Swiss-Prot record:
InterPro entries hit by this protein: ADP-Glc_PPase, ADP_Glu_pyroP_CS, GlgC_bac, GlmU/GlgC-like_hexapep, NTP_transferase_dom, Nucleotide-diphossugar_trans, Trimer_LpxA-like_sf
Function according to Swiss-Prot or TrEMBL: Involved in the biosynthesis of ADP-glucose, a building block required for the elongation reactions to produce glycogen. Catalyzes the reaction between ATP and alpha-D-glucose 1-phosphate (G1P) to produce pyrophosphate and ADP-Glc.
Chain positions recorded as alpha-D-glucose 1-phosphate binding sites: Y112, G177, E192, K193, S210
Species this chain originates from: Methylococcus capsulatus (strain ATCC 33009 / NCIMB 11132 / Bath)
Protein name: Glucose-1-phosphate adenylyltransferase
Lineage, opening ranks: Bacteria, Pseudomonadati, Pseudomonadota, Gammaproteobacteria, Methylococcales
Length: 424
């Protein structure tokens, strides 16, 4: 791509102003087990103070895309509340908005039946906005991306559809839509979640996988959605139905997601399992993590709870409040306890003589005295009784909690017999 197109922020801004972003945020994320029993996957807390939905929303705002629809369905109350509380700063008088678009059976007596159907059921609302381009995003991935560069690429290629792609190990590619491109990056073959993924010609141990990021010319998208809705037996899914049908006849291109400075593949995480969720949070504790949450040029926006600074109290030989190699959010109190290599969300209290190691502690958790917790994810609102031991004997843990294939213990209020009636 010409450097001038990448460098011209005015050109990119003009494109982003003509773009409507639709974030698909209705999924449960069942592989996260009880972590999504009472919330949609995009509403799952991440990174000490955020929710997963904040990442695609921040990418939109930082890229200059200020017209956004969030399509919701599964247990969306906490997600909707989060967006209402934290994302009301856009200027409606300037045409900026973040609209929540719940499944409403607008066109037929059924809920969203697939990714394409979710957009199709909102065609009347989209027509009212009259965008030139429509960007479709997954609401459950963690990454930072300037969508303006992808829009510029889409226009330069005179594409009907552009798909964001990344390189993944061949063994992992079965979980993705996999594509094959020619030398011009035009997609010639696309298979959703293949049992035998085709490798990349220059990297036989990797495959080119879809990120679930699509840019459509609006008229083209409408045409394909209406055609798909009238097709008997369709799954009404972009990856399974629409994309394989259009790649031969229309101009469909792949956009490689790379770091603008280094040219290597940029950070992207699915966090779709308990293991991957724990690992992605643990990565943030490192000295120089790949995902830089301290980048002032690309902030991650979110709802800011009004909490006091974290506090560490007691400094006796046998009772010292301390945290080492950890991230500790506002409102936390480490009272004569030890926290090591862990991530604590807001309003967590760790009481005296307890130890937390290699763990992710979600908001509003109280850990009683004399507890030992290691390699665990503790869900929001849990009250851990005194003398509780988690993560040291997985056989015992399996009797009470969920234990992942890699030995991460997930503890939720329901596991503890604590029925919480608040928004998670």
């Amino acid at each position: 791509m010409p450097e001038s197109m990448h460098a011209s922020s005015r050109f990119v801004s003009r494109l982003t102003r003509q773009t409507l972003a639709l974030i698909l945020a209705g999924g449960r994320g069942s592989r996260l087990q009880k972590l999504t029993e009472w919330r949609a996957k995009p509403a799952v807390p991440f990174g000490g103070k955020f929710r997963i939905i904040d990442f695609p929303l921040s990418n939109c705002v930082n890229s200059g895309i200020r017209q956004v629809g969030v399509l919701t369905q599964y247990k969306a109350d906490s997600l909707i509340r989060h967006i209402q509380q934290g994302w009301g700063f856009l200027r409606g008088e300037l045409g900026e908005f973040i609209d929540i678009m719940p499944a409403q059976q607008r066109l037929q007596e059924s809920w969203y039946a697939g990714t394409a159907d979710a957009v199709y059921q909102n065609l009347d609302i989209i027509r009212q906005r009259d965008p030139e381009f429509i960007m479709i995003l997954a609401g459950d991935h963690v990454y930072k991306m300037d969508y303006g560069l992808m829009l510029a690429y889409h226009v330069e290629r005179k594409a009907d559809l552009t798909i964001g792609c990344m390189e993944v190990p061949l063994a992992d590619a079965k979980a993705f839509g996999v594509m094959q491109m020619d030398g011009e990056q035009r997609i010639r073959k696309f298979v959703e979640k293949p049992s035998d993924p085709p490798p990349m010609p220059n990297r036989p141990d990797h495959a080119a996988a879809s990120m679930g990021i699509y840019i459509f010319n609006t008229a083209f998208l409408f045409e394909q959605l209406i055609k798909d809705a009238d097709t008997p037996g369709s799954n009404h899914d972009f990856g399974m139905d629409i994309i394989p049908q259009v790649i031969q006849k229309y101009r469909v291109f792949a956009y490689r997601f790379r770091n603008a400075q280094s040219g290597v593949q940029a950070y992207w995480r699915d966090v779709g399992t308990v293991d991957s969720y724990w690992a992605a949070n643990m990565e943030l504790i490192g000295v120089d993590p790949e995902l830089n949450l301290y980048d002032q040029e690309w902030p991650i926006w979110t709802y800011q709870a009004q909490t006091p600074p974290a506090k560490f109290v007691f400094d006796d030989d046998d009772r010292r409040g301390m945290a080492v190699d950890s991230m500790v959010s506002g409102g936390c109190i480490i009272s004569g306890a030890e926290v090591r290599h862990s991530l604590l969300f807001s309003n967590v209290r760790v009481n005296s003589f307890s130890r937390v190691l290699d763990s992710v502690i979600l908001p509003d958790v109280n850990i009683g005295r004399h507890c030992r917790i290691s390699r665990a994810v503790i869900d929001k609102g849990c009250n851990i009784p005194p003398n509780t031991v988690i993560g040291e004997n997985l056989e015992d843990d399996r009797k009470r909690f969920y234990v992942s294939p890699e030995g991460i213990v997930l503890v939720t209020p329901d596991c503890l017999g604590q029925r919480l009636h608040f928004h998670r």
